[in-house]
């Protein structure tokens, strides 16, 4: 029986909440499309503080893989197709249909652009599926490659080089997009370091926990320092906020380590709620952007008090997504929409 690691339950829930907060802050910026000057700059830096959600999910996904497996079979891939790729496609069908009605465009156009090409918020799943295949290949070659510091360093150099030239070299950018058919956010080279970082941490998990027990404060200081490095490298485009950026790689990576370290100190705090958020996190990730606009139409009345706005919006989004998920969970067929994790919840029957 696999050991239940409470810190990872808390970690998954917190990352899920961080992604929602990121999208809520984006909604505020989009509402004020004429924002400029100091207000725009402040919004830019606040949004980037919490932009690490998607990279953290990539790191966590691979950490869990190398932590829980030392060898894999073909079933490793088929399970992820059933419970990750199929839900992505089914939710994408629903999203494409709703968007076709909203924008008065064809369903086929919406489905191809969004789901197949990855030009929607669900692009993250396209990235994750590529890493599942890469992980399977590495397992078949040699599991111990996940412990390679050389591979970790090379992946960092590759990711940073790719993102730097993709951002700053127009010819390189245009060439890549000419030959790569999907959304630019799904290019594996822009996320490859997070994959190997998660793999390395999963392989050395107990050592990582021991390190954090002693040096968590130092990692927090490093997180602050790397964010100031990002500020120093900012190029003046205060509308574009993305984790697909070379200047944020150190910050995103260290923030994952920091949050993991903080989560090791949580044992029972709000555990039932945290457990539900963690179990439904994949479904929340796919569903919440669909309802975000409608919910924002109400909660933006609290915008002048940012903390109240975020708290109420977060409460409603999590409540709605988990509520829908709990109903779907009653029918086993919906595992192809909500994934398999919700069915592992230990909920008392009355």
Curated annotation (Swiss-Prot):
One of its GO terms (molecular function) is O-acetyltransferase activity. The keyword Secreted does not apply. GO terms for biological process: enterobacterial common antigen biosynthetic process. Keywords: Cell membrane, Membrane, Transmembrane, Transmembrane helix, Transport. GO terms for cellular component: plasma membrane. It holds the Pfam family Acyl_transf_3. It is a multi-pass membrane protein. Disulfide bonds: none annotated. The chain crosses the membrane at residues 7-29, 44-66, 79-101, 116-138, 145-167, 187-204, 211-233, 243-262, 269-291, 306-328. It comes from the Bacteria. InterPro entries: Acyl_transf_3_dom (IPR002656). Coiled coil: none annotated. It is found in: Cell membrane. Presumably involved in the export of the biofilm adhesin polysaccharide poly-beta-1,6-N-acetyl-D-glucosamine (PNAG, also referred to as PIA) across the cell membrane. Belongs to the acyltransferase 3 family. This is Probable poly-beta-1,6-N-acetyl-D-glucosamine export protein. It comes from Staphylococcus aureus (strain MRSA252).
